[in-house]
């Protein structure tokens, strides 16, 4: 069954395994998430657990959000997500999900929003090669010809534009260490997003059986 938790990206560091191998890891701080709602087939048409992360100031909330959080005997949350394919009997409204639900060696998928780079050209955005610098060349960093046949820009054409700021999931990352007293997960490798950005960690969908 799927496990999941919301947290924030602290940054990257490195640790040594028992065999003395240096492993780069991402530090994810995941303070306890609160179960706001348990959805069932009878009431909602599908099964899921709704969790909330990070308290929201009362002045920024509204009455529906306050009422929804009050059912779980908690304050309104800034971030709310759903986790599907879970064992519903393991969750109760108002209970907490902590990093203890994961263990070392678990394979997870990590979702975050990539860092925004603003408007960028083809070389930075798509990794295209640049043209000659000298000998009368007028082709340096421009995209180049798109052809003269179809008289339109084909869908998906790689052109300059906004780079980054997209939701990305990195699959099959390994949890190297769990630090319950600090609410921290150490995940092998890098994950999308800037420091302090929202991160969603859940059991891998395509992990080797």
UniProtKB/Swiss-Prot annotation:
Q: What is the lineage of its organism?
A: Bacteria, Bacillati, Bacillota, Bacilli, Lactobacillales
Q: What is this protein called?
A: Large ribosomal subunit protein uL3
Main function: One of the primary rRNA binding proteins, it binds directly near the 3'-end of the 23S rRNA, where it nucleates assembly of the 50S subunit.
What HAMAP family does its record include? Answer: Ribosomal_uL3_B
By which gene is this protein encoded?
rplC
Arranged from A to Z, the UniProt key words for this protein are: Ribonucleoprotein, Ribosomal protein, RNA-binding, rRNA-binding
Can you name the source organism?
A: Lactobacillus gasseri (strain ATCC 33323 / DSM 20243 / BCRC 14619 / CIP 102991 / JCM 1131 / KCTC 3163 / NCIMB 11718 / NCTC 13722 / AM63)
> Any idea which GO molecular function terms this record carries?
rRNA binding; structural constituent of ribosome
Family classification: Belongs to the universal ribosomal protein uL3 family.
Ribosomal protein keyword on record: yes
Residue ranges, annotated region (Disordered): 112-146
**Compositionally biased residues, Polar residues:** 112-122
- The residue range of the signal peptide is none
**GO aspect biological process, one term:** translation
């Amino acid at each position: 069954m799927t496990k999941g938790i919301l947290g924030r990206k602290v940054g990257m560091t490195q640790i040594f395994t028992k065999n003395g191998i240096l492993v780069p890891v991402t530090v994810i701080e995941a303070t306890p998430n609160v179960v706001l709602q348990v959805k069932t087939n009878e009431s909602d048409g599908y099964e899921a657990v709704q969790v909330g992360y990070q308290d929201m100031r009362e002045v920024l909330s509204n009455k529906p959000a306050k009422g929804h959080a009050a059912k779980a005997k908690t304050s309104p949350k800034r971030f709310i997500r759903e986790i599907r394919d879970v064992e519903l009997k393991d969750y109760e409204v108002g209970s907490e999900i902590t990093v203890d639900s994961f263990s070392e060696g678990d394979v997870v998928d990590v979702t975050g929003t990539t860092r925004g780079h603003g408007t960028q050209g083809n070389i930075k955005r798509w990794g295209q090669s640049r043209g000659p610098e000298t000998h009368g060349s007028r082709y340096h960093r421009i995209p180049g010809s798109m052809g003269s046949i179809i008289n339109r820009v084909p869908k998906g054409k790689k052109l300059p534009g906004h780079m980054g700021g997209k939701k990305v999931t990195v699959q099959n990352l390994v949890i190297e260490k769990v630090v319950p007293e600090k609410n921290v997960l150490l995940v092998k490798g890098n994950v999308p997003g800037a420091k302090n950005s929202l991160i969603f960690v859940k059991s891998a969908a395509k992990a080797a059986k």
